[in-house]
Amino acid sequence: MKNEEEEPLSPMARVFQSPDIDLCAIINIGFKTKINPDVVLDALKQNVYKHPRFSSKLSENGEKWIETEVNVEDHVIVPYIDPEDICEGGQSFVDDYISRLTLIPLDRSRPLWDIHILNVKTSYAEAVGVIRFNHALADGMSFISLVLACTHKTSNPDMLSTAIPSVKRRSTVSHSLKKTGWFLTAIFTIGSTMRLIWNTLVDMFLLFATMLFLKDTKTPLKGGANVRSNPKTFYHRNISLDDIKLIKNAMNMTINDVLLGITQAALSSYLNRRYEHENNNEEDGVLTSYTNNLPDRIRFRAGCTVNLRSDIGFKPLAEMMVKDSKCRWGNYFSFIILPLSISLETDPLVYLNKSKAMMARTKHSYQAALTYFLIKISLKVLGAKATTSLFNQHLMNITTCVSNVMGPMEEISFNGHPVAYISPSSYGHSHALLIHYTSYAGEMTITITVDPTVIPDPHKICDDMEESLKTMKAVLWERGLLKEAYKV
């Protein structure tokens, strides 16, 4: 019998496993070949005990991990698939299967994860593996490190997957200022510090206001009180990562800036159509043409995940598991609130400029670190129930959440099974819309998670994102800005 050892949960893990939230990650991985279940079982039997989170269960009070025996067969599900069930298409079957999973809770008497093998051909893959686990086990960065540790390069099966380069946080002091005299440097430092303090105070005031009373505008994308208990549906689309990098270089911004600009443009277009449809219905079926159907002064905010590790690049799994590692395993991230601009712009580059300015400001604030610290203090002072209630209220009062995770740079394979795409998301949240971006092998996968009773057509949001990317690239080309970007 395995000795039971206990380890406390991190603050974010305690929040995520709370019955009032019970946030679960669900990762849809497409493969280019059919999946051999025996290969998956053998690999898990050899490796599951190397990772304590996947061989531990929660204590009864939800505060500690307890190591336990793992019967791998209980965690790997290979459902019988009736050919008649996929007569309308494999993609529809997989989508419905994953949607039903969001209504089935994980068994808390054993480690909080399972794997579902669906040997069904879809639009993008020959077979699909669905990995589901309680978000208390890990965040997106930790999961990708686990993927890298379990896979090999498709181009060279003898080599482990390409490690993603280590990324350091950018300095807030420009190189030109470092070369100036001490007086100008001191003036800049004082001004920058004052701005940092002011931004942090404003952000924390808005955070508390959001938890207590400040709500987003009720739009066709905002869910109601029961959205958390409704089933979720998932939709994903691949776009070119090279196109995103071209725009990034041409506009002198980051990939996150570009993705946020695309998100603002796409959601503005989608909402404009939804409002047009509602206006037309209200006029007894008389169709009218509107250029701008958006209400004035829409408050539309997104929670954005922020990695709190001092080393924000990826590290080998073994290094992440070491105590006091600068890039450690777990849920070491926090949230910031981004006020998205929902408006119709004649110049699509306006969305990019707005996102760049917004992200530059958020980087000059301690909101993320303070939010994590306050959650930690609140758990000690108020307890888990009160803390999760405040956290959930904060989520309910904003409209969506957005995240971006770097994936492997080259195509990878799991024991001879080449991976076609990686599409992560989550459920258990109080939003009708969730947006995840994941890069993999030269492509960016957009994953949209929706409550279908609120958003029946998530594919149209992806259409708008794809069209926004094309439009931005075309405008930059017309203005001659992409020619310089190609040289970078």
Curated annotation (Swiss-Prot):
Keywords: Acyltransferase, Cell membrane, Endoplasmic reticulum, Glycoprotein, Membrane, Transferase, Transmembrane, Transmembrane helix. Mostly expressed in flowers and siliques and at low levels in stems. The active site is at 135 (proton acceptor). It is found in: Cell membrane; Endoplasmic reticulum membrane. One of its GO terms (biological process) is triglyceride biosynthetic process. GO terms for molecular function: diacylglycerol O-acyltransferase activity; long-chain-alcohol O-fatty-acyltransferase activity. Its EC number is 2.3.1.20, 2.3.1.75. It is a single-pass membrane protein. Its main location: membrane. PANTHER family: O-ACYLTRANSFERASE (WSD1-LIKE) FAMILY PROTEIN, WAX ESTER SYNTHASE_DIACYLGLYCEROL ACYLTRANSFERASE 10-RELATED. In the N-terminal section; belongs to the long-chain O-acyltransferase family. Bifunctional wax ester synthase/diacylglycerol acyltransferase. Involved in cuticular wax biosynthesis. This is Wax ester synthase/diacylglycerol acyltransferase 8. It comes from Arabidopsis thaliana.
